[in-house]
C-alpha cells in the first residue's frame, strides 16, 4: 500500500516509515524541509507547508491507501509562553485541516481509506485513580483541550468516507525520543527520583509498540475512533522512578517537589504532575499483542541496548 506520513522526518515518523518500507510498502514522507531530512531507505520525501492543501503531496494523496498525521509543534521544546501554547494548538489544527481539505479535493474513488491522526493521552486530563478507557470523558487541561480540538479537526474526514483513527499516545520509551531522554537524564547524573509526590499514574509505551499500533490502525479496517496508545503495565510515577534507577544502577531518591516544578515550569508542570490510569482497551479488543507489555522489560530494552 501507499502511505503518506506528515511529520515523517521526526523520531516516530522515521521509525514508522522504516517499518512500512521494510514490508515493501510505498512510503512518502511529508516535510517542511525535505532537503535537510537524512535519506531513508525506501522512503520518498516531499515538501509540504503544513498549512495549505497545495503542492505535489496533494497529487500523491490520490490512490494512497492511508495517511498518518504526526505534524505539530513539539510540546517538550521551549517554555510554554502564551505564544508557544498558541503555536502548539494552531500547528496541529492547520496541518490537519490541510489534510482534510486535500482529501475533499481528491475524487471519491481515489481517496485514502484511512486517516490515522496522532493525539495525546493528555486528552483525559488529570484523573486521579479513575480507570480510563477510550470511552472516558475528556479533561479540561491545556493539552486536553488541544487533543480535543485536534481530534475534532481529524474527524472532519469521516463524512468524506475516510476511516479515522485517533491514537492517544502516552510517553514513548525510545532512545531517540526527547521526552524519554529528559525523563531519564537526572538518573544518569545521580539526581533522579519521584516527581511531585510520585502518586500520579504514569502511562507509557515502547516505541516498537507505538509503531505497531500505527500499523494496526492502518491495516485493520475494524479499528476506528480513539485508541489509547499505552502499555498495559501502568504504574505510579514513583514506581517508574525506582525502576529507572534499578535498570541504570542509580539511586531514585532525589525528589522534585511539586511547588518547585510549578515555579520553574509553570503550566508545563502538568506534563509531569498530572496522571491518569489509562488502559489500552481497544488495542486489546482488536487483538494487538504488545511486544513490551511490562515496564521493566521496556526499560531494559531502551536503556541498556546500544
State the predicted function of each range:
Residues 3-23:
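N-terminal Rossmann NAD(P)H-binding glycine-rich loop of SDR-like oxidoreductase domains
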Residues 85, 97-141:
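Conserved Rossmann-fold NAD(P)-dependent oxidoreductase catalytic core, especially the SDR/UDP-sugar
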Residues 119-120, 152-175:
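Conserved beta-loop-beta element that borders a ligand/cofactor-binding pocket
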Residues 184-192, 200-234:
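Alpha-helical substrate-binding/gating segment
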Residues 270-306:
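C-terminal amphipathic/interface module of NAD(P)-dependent oxidoreductases
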Residues 220-267, 300-306:
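Mid/C-terminal beta-alpha module of Rossmann-like enzyme folds, strongest
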Residues 43-95:
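NAD(P)H-binding glycine-rich loop region in Rossmannoid oxidoreductase-like domains
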Residues 148, 160-162, 173-182, 217-227:
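Glycine/proline-rich active-site loop of Rossmann-fold NAD(P)-dependent oxidoreductases
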